[in-house]
Regions:
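N-terminal flexible segment immediately upstream of the FAD-binding catalytic core
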Residues: 1-2, 17
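Rieske [2Fe-2S] iron-sulfur-binding domain
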Residues: 2-3, 9-10, 23-147
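Short Pro/Gly-enriched beta-strand edge/turn motifs at strand-loop
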Residues: 17-26, 92-100, 173-176, 237-241
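A short, structural micro-pattern
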Residues: 18, 110, 117-119, 252, ...
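Short beta-strand or tight-loop elements
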Residues: 20-22, 42, 112, 189, ...
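C-terminal catalytic domain of Rieske-type non-heme iron oxygenases
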Residues: 53, 131-336
Length: 336
């Protein structure tokens, strides 16, 4: 009954969610072989056509439901591993080897494709009709910033739990005691919600963060602690962006992407933009953020099920203002 009251029953099957973009892979993950992904409970295959463009379609061959991701590519066309049926651009079946010359290809032999784009070094899918273009990040076109991508991981936790965590700062002294949260003030000032720009809604705050040796490449400081001016905001349904500005003028922008595989597992990746001098190796820059993400994963995988969205038994306090507003907007969206 609680799930029904809170709009979370069958969360990933909610039709409105299908009309948004979700990250499923890095662009570099898709080269000379097809790959298999799962989005909102749907199994899909992605491959690169002859011209390098991406094609995404239902994973099962319409003939005998063989997994097409186990096939291979010939001149940008996907060949089924079972009977050799071949699919070209737009998922159109162009060859059935067992058919005699002149026999037409059945209309049902073609694959059902889904929308796919490549942006920010990531592969994004939309299962329905995209509501809006993908958000723009000004740092991407600013030559003073560099972009650093990280691998796409699979977490055993609902995407809703991940977003709730990424919008929260009160867990820092506890979950992140091993990285930047040690000794951090536990009391959080009253926050005000605002549009941070045209695409993200959230709040601004300042913290004094621990700056251990392994964080110094990220912070650009040798001090034991550093002042951070930060923002955290969401873009519906499941994207979070955090920005960090240091006194030196260094800016560190993190895009946190949670993609529902099913009700209880998700893809996760984060992307960083920085206006540093580009001399520090990317792996060194992101090592600290990876460690922070691992602390989150360990905690989140202890939580069960989809995050309740509506009026629930969950107790909220003033520091939860951003996550409460995100849940309110998300519930309104999925029930629209």
């Amino acid at each position: 009954m609680e799930k029904i009251l809170n709009g979370t029953e069958g969360f990933v099957d909610k039709q409105p969610l299908k009309n948004f973009w979700y990250v499923v892979a890095l662009g570099d993950d898709i080269d000379s072989n097809p790959i298999s992904v799962k989005l909102l409970n749907e199994d899909l295959v992605i491959w690169r056509g002859f011209d390098g463009s991406l094609i995404a379609a239902a994973e099962k061959c319409p003939h005998r439901q063989a997994p097409l991701s186990h096939g291979h590519l010939e001149n940008g066309c996907l060949v089924c591993p079972y009977h050799g049926w071949t699919f070209g651009e737009s998922g159109k079946c162009i060859n059935i080897p067992s058919s005699s010359d002149g026999v037409p290809i059945p209309s049902k032999a073609h694959l059902n494709t889904v929308e796919v784009i490549e942006k920010y070094g990531l592969v994004w899918l939309c299962l329905g009709e995209p509501n809006n273009p993908l958000f723009e990040l000004k740092e991407e076109s600013d030559s003073s910033f560099r972009r650093i991508n990280t691998e796409v991981q699979k977490w055993k936790v609902a995407a809703t739990r991940m977003v709730d965590n990424f919008l929260d700062i009160t867990h820092f002294p506890y979950v992140h005691a091993g990285t930047f949260g040690a000794g951090q003030e536990t009391k959080v000032p009253n926050i005000s919600l605002e549009y941070l720009d045209n695409d993200f809604f959230g709040y601004r705050y300042d913290i004094l963060a621990a700056n251990p040796e392994e964080a110094k490449s990220t912070s650009g400081s040798n001090e034991k602690s550093v002042e951070r001016s930060m923002t955290s905001g969401f873009n519906l349904p499941l994207t979070v962006r955090s920005t960090i500005t240091y006194k030196s003028g260094l800016e560190h922008v993190i895009l946190l992407l949670s993609t529902p595989i099913d009700e209880i597992s998700s893809y996760f990746t984060f992307v960083i933009w920085r206006n540093d001098d580009f001399t520090i190796p990317a792996d060194e820059v992101i090592a600290f953020d990876r460690a922070i993400g691992e602390e989150d994963r360990v905690m989140l995988e202890k939580l069960n099920g989809v995050m309740p969205l509506g009026k629930t038994a969950l107790v909220n306090v003033q520091s939860d203002k951003a996550t409460v507003e995100w849940r309110r907007q998300l519930l309104k969206l999925i029930n629209s």
